[in-house]
C-alpha cells in the first residue's frame, strides 16, 4: 500500500465524525499506541495503525484516509476502544470515516458483498467449519456441547439488514440477500 500523502485538510472533520458517533474522540488521542499494539488488524497489516488514523482524523486529513482503503482493514473488534486510556474510541472514528466514504460513493472492497451474503445466510461472517480430533474424528457442535448456530429470527434479521441499508450500500441483489 502506498504512503498516505496529507495534501488537503478538512477542518470540519471532528464535527462530521461526532455527528455519526458521539463516542469517537480523535482529538483526545495522545498516541500512547495501546490501541495499535492490541489491534489484530495491525498485526496482519503493518500499514494499519488505529492511533495514526486517530491523529490523521484529528488533523483533518479525511480525503487521504477514505481514499487510501486502509479503513476497511478494521475488524471492528473494539479492542482499541477497550484498551484506550483516554476512551477516544478509534473504532468509532474508523466506522464514522467508512460511513463518510460510502456516502461519498467510495465502495467497500469486493469481498464485502460476499461477507454480507454469508452473514445473511449464516448469521456470521464465516461459515461453520468441521472440527476434528487428533485421530481425525469429526465432531459436530452437539458433540462439543456448543449452542446451535444460525439466525434465531430470520425475518427480523433480514429486516434489520434492510433498515441499516446494506442492500443498497453494497449493491446486493434482493434475491441474494433473501437466500
Short names for language-model regions:
Residues 1-28, 34-38, 46-55, 62, ...:
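Non-ligating segments of multi-cofactor redox enzymes
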Residues 25-42, 68-88:
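Cysteine-centered iron-sulfur cluster-binding motifs in ferredoxin-type domains/subunits
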Residues 54-72:
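N-terminal leader/targeting helix
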